[in-house]
Curated annotation (Swiss-Prot):
Protein name from the UniProt record: Organelle RRM domain-containing protein 2, mitochondrial
Single GO MF annotation: mRNA binding
PANTHER family (alphabetical): NUCLEOLAR PROTEIN 8 (PTHR48029:SF1)
Originating species: Arabidopsis thaliana (Mouse-ear cress)
Assembly, per entry: Interacts with RBG3/ORRM3. Binds to RBG2/ORRM5.
Residue stretch of the organelle transit peptide: 1-28
Predominant place of localization: mitochondrion
Compartment(s) where it occurs, according to its Swiss-Prot or TrEMBL record: Mitochondrion
InterPro entries: Nucleotide-bd_a/b_plait_sf (IPR012677), RBD_domain_sf (IPR035979), RRM_dom (IPR000504)
Residues bearing PTM Phosphoserine: S64
GO CC annotation: mitochondrion
Acyltransferase in keyword set: no
Domain RRM: 56-134
Amino acid sequence: MAMAMRLPAISRAVTEVASAPVGLRRLFCSNASRFSFLSPQAESQTPARPQAEPSTNLFVSGLSKRTTSEGLRTAFAQFGEVADAKVVTDRVSGYSKGFGFVRYATLEDSAKGIAGMDGKFLDGWVIFAEYARPREQSQSYQPQNNMSRPPYYGNR
């Protein structure tokens, strides 16, 4: 179902690439929907992710390893006032993990940002923009009173 939500953005990107000549040649691009890897029955059984409620915070995926927070801010700033832009990076290598977040000042600007950047190219990669979902707390983590136990159990 998540893939079905991205099909319009993917189709726009394929059309954009197919219409641009590469040197003296044309690049052949086709929409792969007719070559589906899942049967229609399997696709209908796939649980759908709930839609995120509109907010000023956007989740951006499909980023290049070269994309920086400043580059992300610049790309989205043409659609409204960007309060913050952050590319999530690996702690060890410092390279982008391929996703990030953009926070706009208003809901209207965030809607324009999604409409303007979803399925577009940034640093040579097709990116996807959608409203960010709040982080879910895992079931294993249960906050407890700090006085009940020490946080670590050493050799006793």
